[in-house]
């Protein structure tokens, strides 16, 4: 499947600039392969690829919201400790869904039952930025914001026990806050960062795309 991602590439480059005071902990431009340190949860090798400076993942049937926890191809890596300083994670996402709740997300992820996700999702026929919190499989929507776009920047900022989600529409200069809340607190939970997508149609092949992934330590 071919993608025409000129605006997407510009979006990824547009929010890659950072303050000189901030520390780049990790970045991945998906230049021909995945960067070091990523692992897959329920990997299906035929349903992901790295191409053209981006990670493309098939949006397959399955779910991660609530009790089902059968979504495939969750890409995860350890998150920096945010107890003593803010951590910021960002990525550019393109998603062209046709199926109810079909979505592509950036998440602060502990396990399948504990996370905060921020993504581009189709809800009742409308493209939306959706932010949601899940703890012990109990879910709560923190934001659902209609947006007429299939490509967007997503950003999570975590400090202490709080998390905030922002989004950056293509062509915009300033991030827009989507929502905020408390992090879930799983017993002995170790925070990870995840890129994932799910709730795709069973009878069509849809692919979401991620680019320009960054983890920063924010200097206050």
What feature does the model see in each segment?
Residues 21-40:
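Extracellular carbohydrate-recognition regions
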Residues 49-69:
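Short carbohydrate-recognition loop motifs
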Residues 132-153:
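Short, aromatic/His-centered strand-loop micro-motif at the edge of beta-sheets
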Residues 180-206:
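Flexible glycan-contacting loops in extracellular carbohydrate-active proteins
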Residues 30, 210-215:
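Extracellular beta-strand elements of beta-rich domains used
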Residues 30, 89-91, 152-180:
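Carbohydrate-binding surfaces in secreted/extracellular proteins
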Residues 11-20:
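Hydrophobic h-region of N-terminal signal peptides that target proteins for export
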Residues 63-127:
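Secretory/extracellular carbohydrate-interaction modules
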